[in-house]
């Protein structure tokens, strides 16, 4: 919100010596975010004067049209003689009033003006455009042509309000009332302890039955609608300079008189308005929900297909506007041919949620929707309509129609009961009842009571909903900087839980293995499941959809970590980082089988155990997952060696690393699941409650997925359920036994069917070898026709060691034979001869 200081002074009698910086400091202290103070015309120096063009001579022989003009500037040049000026603009004629800058002046950008010879003539000054004066481009494509009533020789700096200060305020979503001069003026008056001249205090005629008919079919979407009519408008009337300048300084451009007035009143009072050409409205104005598939062409010239949830303004022919967002082109005021002489003014209060969803659905943000989304004072509608009527009568020569239409759905004002000492308890400062009551009254509240206060919240503050909001108002107005700095006395901590410790160990272990953590937003689009090649009935396709998503492309909560990680990998690869190893641990979300509506917890008391349990039961399941993605080189090449590329074995090893940190035995076997390559995918499982449970997958991604997502070749990934891994843990990680006695190594080569997983053979060998087995390692896989059709050879190195003695050859061989025997029994393995 851009607030010109000169405009602000109309409502608050600030000291003449107060600068924009001073006001900024006061408002920041009151809790507003004033980002900067823009100095308009700070480097501007006169003389600048109103001039009248006396003669124009067209100069020929140049590459572009050039005019030699004589301009009457009165006594501004000290002589009263006409000023000779060379100008290239074409949008003025003899007799027009223009802005002339004379020699000795300095324009914005340190542009000094002096008499100089150009195009064969001497130019004593310059005829100015708005851009040259720091006013911005007015869209005319030329110099400023002033209305004829301005007197020649008048100081143009004061006339055009070229010197001013503008506060640029970032209004937070809960402070919608500050998207107006009225709201900022109220905060300024409170900050300075000065009275406020409220621009909304106007004499408004009572509603009657003679106004333009209005029918509201959706009272929940529109609880207040005021319609006023102005007739006899001069279609040639244009916005005066003061109105144009205020709009420009507030960040809006001048369009036409009627539109400028509605924008001006919106900036002044915070109430969005819309003006309809009365001759283009057929029948009564209505407010209803759109019919699915209805069409509407909005003021931006775009034809929009409406949704059944859209709130629309209608006449007898159909929709004529998106309520609270943008009007329709069919009923707009004609500012090109100048045929509009009668207008109907709409000042309404629309449901903030409906407006926000419509604006987002149609990707159509407007100044009106921005205000309705944040909350507009419903009681300001009639005053805003009256202010608009007054300005149209004053500036366009119109007449106010006697009819006043006002359709209202009554609602009781919001009241809050608060102990008088509640702000004291929140802030730890003794304010006292008198201070609390005074501060609440300053923000517009009506306050009754002694120790227990009954507070009626003002209509322009929908953000005040509970006692803590009122306490915040008292604290911020008394000054956050006045709160004492005291260290709290926290209770003794109980340390991290076992789950928290595991999460930290997992992160440290992956970082130690060379992975970089890359947290991502938990939002996904459902199209990613098609890209991953998941089956139509895959559980991951059941998502929790957001009612108010940040992006329409990602409207759901993630059921897998891989989309975010792979997106991060793709972005980094596209920016030149090709050797990547990323990881993330985070929650995924699965809807419960029984959908429940979450209860709304109270804010003025502690929720009951039943309320908390009901809320918890409505939440989706949120297991924590861990995932890694790899691409490029895993080990860099150099003088020390060739290096090696990352492959799917690294992804499997990452899963084993997590299992070791959890103290869990991880079962790894061949698997097949999207988005992994069917021949290079490992299924990860643990034993939970005596049964094997698949908790994730690791391997190389499918080539089709890589192509669809634009990922590097041979990209690998792993994802597993960290909570399930923790549940399978024995709790305490057992360290390995350490023996000082020699190790006995036995190698075995077993021939098995190609379909037998290595993990099954290893598990049988480990169990059969008994407690003397220290470790087992697969060191060779061999396939040949000599082994037989459909056969492969797996070679293992078995290390045996005893804790209390040196093993004999016979003991090691016996353990080896037992291991081979059990492998033969379970997997059909045979010793390779």
Curated annotation (Swiss-Prot):
Keyword RNA-binding among record annotations: yes
User: Which GO cellular component terms are attached?
Assistant: phenylalanine-tRNA ligase complex
Compartment(s) where it occurs, according to its Swiss-Prot or TrEMBL record? Cytoplasm
Q: Which reaction does it catalyse?
A: tRNA(Phe) + L-phenylalanine + ATP = L-phenylalanyl-tRNA(Phe) + AMP + diphosphate + H(+)
Identify which cofactors the protein needs according to its UniProt entry.
Mg(2+)
**Enzyme class name:** ligase
Q: Look up the EC number in the record and give it.
A: 6.1.1.20
Which is a Pfam family this sequence falls into? FDX-ACB
Q: List the PROSITE patterns hit by this protein, alphabetically.
A: B5, FDX_ACB, TRBD
Span of domain FDX-ACB: 739-832
Using the UniProt record, give the first listed, main subcellular location.
Answer: cytoplasm
Please provide the record's keywords in A-Z order: Aminoacyl-tRNA synthetase, ATP-binding, Cytoplasm, Ligase, Magnesium, Metal-binding, Nucleotide-binding, Protein biosynthesis, RNA-binding, tRNA-binding
The cross-references to SUPFAM superfamilies, in alphabetical order and at most eight, read: Anticodon-binding domain of PheRS, Class II aaRS and biotin synthetases, Nucleic acid-binding proteins, PheT/TilS domain, Putative DNA-binding domain
| Residue ranges of domain tRNA-binding in the record | 42-157
**Molecular-function annotations in GO:** ATP binding; magnesium ion binding; phenylalanine-tRNA ligase activity; tRNA binding
CDD domains named among the record's database cross-references: PheRS_beta_core, tRNA_bind_bactPheRS
- Biological process terms in GO annotation: phenylalanyl-tRNA aminoacylation
Q: Where is the B5 domain?
A: 411-485
Q: Does the keyword Lipoprotein feature in the UniProt annotation?
A: no
List of residues binding Mg(2+): 463, 469, 472-473
Q: Which NCBIfam families match?
A: pheT_bact
Family label: Belongs to the phenylalanyl-tRNA synthetase beta subunit family. Type 1 subfamily.
Among HAMAP family, the record links this protein to:
Phe_tRNA_synth_beta1 (MF_00283)
- The protein's assembly and partners: Tetramer of two alpha and two beta subunits.
Would you tell me the protein name for this molecule? Phenylalanine--tRNA ligase beta subunit
The species is Streptomyces avermitilis (strain ATCC 31267 / DSM 46492 / JCM 5070 / NBRC 14893 / NCIMB 12804 / NRRL 8165 / MA-4680)
By which gene is this protein encoded?
A: pheT
């Amino acid at each position: 919100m851009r607030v010109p200081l000169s405009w602000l002074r109309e409502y608050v009698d600030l000291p003449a010596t107060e600068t924009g910086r001073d006001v900024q400091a006061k408002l920041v202290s009151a809790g507003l975010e004033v980002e900067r103070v823009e100095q308009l015309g700070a480097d501007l120096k006169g003389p600048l004067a109103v001039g009248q063009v006396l003669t124009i001579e067209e100069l020929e022989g140049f590459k572009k049209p050039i005019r030699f003009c004589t301009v009457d500037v009165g006594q501004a040049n000290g002589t009263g003689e006409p000023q000779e000026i060379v100008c290239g603009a074409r949008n003025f004629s003899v007799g027009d009033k223009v802005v002339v800058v004379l020699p000795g002046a300095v324009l914005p950008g340190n542009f000094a003006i002096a008499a100089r010879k150009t195009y064969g003539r001497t130019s004593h000054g310059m005829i100015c455009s708005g851009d040259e004066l720091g006013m911005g481009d007015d869209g005319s494509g030329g110099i400023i042509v002033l209305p004829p009533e301005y007197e020649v020789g008048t100081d143009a700096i004061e006339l055009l309000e070229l010197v001013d200060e503008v506060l640029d305020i970032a209004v937070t979503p809960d402070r919608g009332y500050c998207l107006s001069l009225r709201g900022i003026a109220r905060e300024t008056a409170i900050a300075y302890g000065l009275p406020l001249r409220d621009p909304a205090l106007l004499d408004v005629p009572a509603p009657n039955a003679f106004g333009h008919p209005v029918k509201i079919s959706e009272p929940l979407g529109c609880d207040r609608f005021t319609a006023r009519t102005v007739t006899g408008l001069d279609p040639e009337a244009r916005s005066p300079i003061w109105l144009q300048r205020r709009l420009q300084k507030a960040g809006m451009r001048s369009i036409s008189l009627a539109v400028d007035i509605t924008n001006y009143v919106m900036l002044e009072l915070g109430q969005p308005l819309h003006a309809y050409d009365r001759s283009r409205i057929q029948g009564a104005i209505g407010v209803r929900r759109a019919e699915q598939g209805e069409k509407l062409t909005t003021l931006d010239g775009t034809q929009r297909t409406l949704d059944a949830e859209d709130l629309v303004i209608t006449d007898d022919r159909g929709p004529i506007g998106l309520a609270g967002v943008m009007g329709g082109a069919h009923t707009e005021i004609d500012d090109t041919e100048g045929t509009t002489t009668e207008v109907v003014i709409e000042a309404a209060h629309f449901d903030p949620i409906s407006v926000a969803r419509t604006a987002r659905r149609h990707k159509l943000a407007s100044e009106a929707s921005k205000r309705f989304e944040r909350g507009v004072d419903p009681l300001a509608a009639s005053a805003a309509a009256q202010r608009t009527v007054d300005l149209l009568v004053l500036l366009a020569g119109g007449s106010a129609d006697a009819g006043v239409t006002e359709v209202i759905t009554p609602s009781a004002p919001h009241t809050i009961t608060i102990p008088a000492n509640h702000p004291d308890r929140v802030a730890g400062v003794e304010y006292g009842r008198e201070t609390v009551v005074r501060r609440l009254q300053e923000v517009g509240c009506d306050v009754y009571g002694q120790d227990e206060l009954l507070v009626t919240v003002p209509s322009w503050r929908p953000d005040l909903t509970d006692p803590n909001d009122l306490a915040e108002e008292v604290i911020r107005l008394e000054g956050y900087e006045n709160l004492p700095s005291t260290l709290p006395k926290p209770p003794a901590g109980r340390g991290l839980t076992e789950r928290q410790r595991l999460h930290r160990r997992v992160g440290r272990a992956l970082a130690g293995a060379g992975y970089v953590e890359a947290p991502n937003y938990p939002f996904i689009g459902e199209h990613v499941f098609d890209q991953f090649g998941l089956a139509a009935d895959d559980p991951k396709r059941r998502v929790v959809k957001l009612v108010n998503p940040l992006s329409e492309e990602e409207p759901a909560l993630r059921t897998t970590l891989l989309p975010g990680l792979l997106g991060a990998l793709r972005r980094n690869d596209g920016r030149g980082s090709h050797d990547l190893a990323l990881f993330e641990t985070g929650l995924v979300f699965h809807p419960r089988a029984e959908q429940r509506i979450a209860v709304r917890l109270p804010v003025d008391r502690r929720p009951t155990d039943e309320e908390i349990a009901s809320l918890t039961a409505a939440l989706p399941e949120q297991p924590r997952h861990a995932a890694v993605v790899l691409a490029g080189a895993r080990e860099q090449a150099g003088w020390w060696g060739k290096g090696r590329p990352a492959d799917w074995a690294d992804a499997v090893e990452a899963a084993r690393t997590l299992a070791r940190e959890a103290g869990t035995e991880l079962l790894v076997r061949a698997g097949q699941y999207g988005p992994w390559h069917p021949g290079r995918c490992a299924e990860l499982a643990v034993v939970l409650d005596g049964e094997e449970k698949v908790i994730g997958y690791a391997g190389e991604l499918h080539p089709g997925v890589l192509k669809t997502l634009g990922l590097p070749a041979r990209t690998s990934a792993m994802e597993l359920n960290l909570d399930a891994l923790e549940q399978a843990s024995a709790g305490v990680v057992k360290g390995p036994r350490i023996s000082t006695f020699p190790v006995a190594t036995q190698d075995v080569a077993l021939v098995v069917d190609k379909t037998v997983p290595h993990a099954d053979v290893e598990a049988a060998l480990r169990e059969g070898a008994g407690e003397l087995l220290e470790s087992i390692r697969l060191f060779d896989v061999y396939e040949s026709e000599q082994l037989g059709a459909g056969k492969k050879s797996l070679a293992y190195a078995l290390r045996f060691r005893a804790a209390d003695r040196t093993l004999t050859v016979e003991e090691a061989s016996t353990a080896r034979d037992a291991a081979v025997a059990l492998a033969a029994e379970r997997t059909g393995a045979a010793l390779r001869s």
